[in-house]
Structure formats: C-alpha cells, structure tokens
Amino acid sequence: MPELPEVETVMRGMRLHLDGKTIARVAVRRADLRFPFPADLVARLEGATITGFARRAKYILIRLDTGDTLLLHLGMSGRVLLSLPGDAPVPDRHEHFFFETTDGTRCGLIDPRRFGAVDLMPTAEERAHRLLARLGPEPLGNQFSQHWLQEVLARRRTSIKAALLDQTVVAGLGNIYVSEALFRAGIHPARLACTLDAAEDARLVQAIRAVLREAIAAGGSSLRDYVQPDGELGYFQHAWRVYGRAGQGCPDCPGPPACHGVERLEQAGRSSFFCPLCQPPPGKVS
C-alpha cells in the first residue's frame, strides 16, 4: 500500500499540473471500489475549478471553488497517472475514474485491486469525514512530538510496531517506514509500546521524521505498482536499511560473528525487519 511519502509525492505531482485548472469532463468507469462513488459526483465536479491540494495521512484532498473537496485514496495498489496537453493517454483497463481539465490535462485513477476510494464532501466538513475524523497527528506536523508519543504509548499494551501502524496514534505510516524508523531508533519491533522511555520516544520521533523526509525527497519507494504521476519510479527503495533485506548484512554492524545480518519477524500477518544487535529483543534491552 502506498504510504505517506508516496501519497505526498503523488499529491505534489498533481498540484504541479492541475492547480488552478477547471474540470471540463469526468468519467466513472467502475463505481464499486472500496466504497460506492457519490451518485452526483460527475455533476458536482464538471465545471469546478481546482483551488488547492492537501494530504491527510494517506488521503489526497483536492479543494474546489464550489466549496467541495474531492478525496482520493490509492488503496493497496492504486496509482494516479497524469497526461499533459498533447500527450496520448495510455489506455489501462484498471482505470476506473478520470477527469480532464479545459486545457487537456488528464488525471486518471488506476486501481487493479479496487481497494481505493473516491469521495466528495463539503470542504468545511473535511475534519468530520468518516475516513479522516479519527486520524492521529501528522508525523511531520508540530503536534507529533516526544510528549505526544509518550502519552499515547503509555496506554498501549501492544507492540511498538502495531502501535505505530494504528492510524489513530500517528497518521500515514505503514510497514516500510515503521520498520525503517524503528531500526534508526534502535527499537525492536516486538517491544511493548508502553515500555519505551522518554529518550526512546524522542529518538523514535526523530527517526520517523528523518525517514519520511528522505523518502519524500526520493519520490517514495517503488514496490510493485507504485509510480509517480508522471510514470517515473520512486527511488527510496535503494536506501532501505532493513526493510526487505532479511539475510543481508546490517549497514550499521561489523558483520559476523557479532551480527549475522537483518532478520525477518512476522507480526499480525505482516513482515517486520530488524537487526538483532542494533535493536535488542524484548528482555535484552540495554
């Protein structure tokens, strides 16, 4: 699933080519994605001018001069593809929704597994939307701090990995960036969240911010379906230190015999990757 850096990259690409433009034509080819499309979606979008873009967690918000906001979610394998004026759009049988602006710019949502979402809401009611209302703070925002994390985690008797994947704790994180941040912070993914001390909370906040900023600068991580709106791949997968690297050497360790490399752990059906030397297992915290 595209995580915060990928969604931020997509949002920025859309903003670059669509901000200030007027939607001339809208087409819905399949309305049965994760949720049904609004019945009046086409009528409310056609003729509207795009006035701004935002991202909340893994959701893209497109604000319109009509007072509405168009919400897009890429789901498990969705992507946005832009065609600029004069380009020939590349047909894709999994494109379920698209719109064109008056200058010929085309924006399509391609979603093979149909776990994505498209919705329309009054802009004034964004915070109360059912998909946004319970989200935690943005990890790159001011509210996300060592004090916030310490207070929230003190009540969590789950693993720190599970806590960080909970979108009510912090918004937008997923498996890749949680694994990378925990490695940088030196925290084992199976540690109980409530056992972290203040110094570890502070390191973790810093690690999350650093990983996300670096990933955004690299255009995200291209894993299977993800590409940027212009069709280019992201590059942060080349900077992964532990994710997907089980059996390979830890970049921060001297190697055997002290460390035999990155290990994989399954947690709640998801793979976690860690270095057993840099991230001491529970019960061996130094």
UniProtKB/Swiss-Prot annotation:
EC number(s) given by UniProt: 3.2.2.23, 4.2.99.18
SMART domains noted in UniProt: Fapy_DNA_glyco, H2TH
GO biological process, one term: base-excision repair
SUPFAM superfamilies (UniProt xref): Glucocorticoid receptor-like (DNA-binding domain), N-terminal domain of MutM-like DNA repair proteins, S13-like H2TH domain
Zinc finger (FPG-type): 241-280
GO molecular function terms noted in the UniProt entry: 8-oxo-7,8-dihydroguanine DNA N-glycosylase activity; class I DNA-(apurinic or apyrimidinic site) endonuclease activity; damaged DNA binding; zinc ion binding
Keyword Thylakoid in record: no
UniProt keyword annotations, A-Z: DNA damage, DNA repair, DNA-binding, Glycosidase, Hydrolase, Lyase, Metal-binding, Multifunctional enzyme, Zinc, Zinc-finger
Binding residue positions for DNA: 94, 113, 156
Catalytic activity: Hydrolysis of DNA containing ring-opened 7-methylguanine residues, releasing 2,6-diamino-4-hydroxy-5-(N-methyl)formamidopyrimidine; 2'-deoxyribonucleotide-(2'-deoxyribose 5'-phosphate)-2'-deoxyribonucleotide-DNA = a 3'-end 2'-deoxyribonucleotide-(2,3-dehydro-2,3-deoxyribose 5'-phosphate)-DNA + a 5'-end 5'-phospho-2'-deoxyribonucleoside-DNA + H(+)
Active site: 2 (schiff-base intermediate with dna), 3 (proton donor), 58 (proton donor), 270 (proton donor)
CDD domains: EcFpg-like_N
Cofactor: Zn(2+)
Bound cofactor: record note: Binds 1 zinc ion per subunit.
Entry-linked HAMAP family: Fapy_DNA_glycosyl (MF_00103)
Function: Involved in base excision repair of DNA damaged by oxidation or by mutagenic agents. Acts as a DNA glycosylase that recognizes and removes damaged bases. Has a preference for oxidized purines, such as 7,8-dihydro-8-oxoguanine (8-oxoG). Has AP (apurinic/apyrimidinic) lyase activity and introduces nicks in the DNA strand. Cleaves the DNA backbone by beta-delta elimination to generate a single-strand break at the site of the removed base with both 3'- and 5'-phosphates.
Family according to the record: Belongs to the FPG family.
Quaternary assembly: Monomer.
Name recorded for this polypeptide: Formamidopyrimidine-DNA glycosylase
Gene that this sequence comes from: mutM
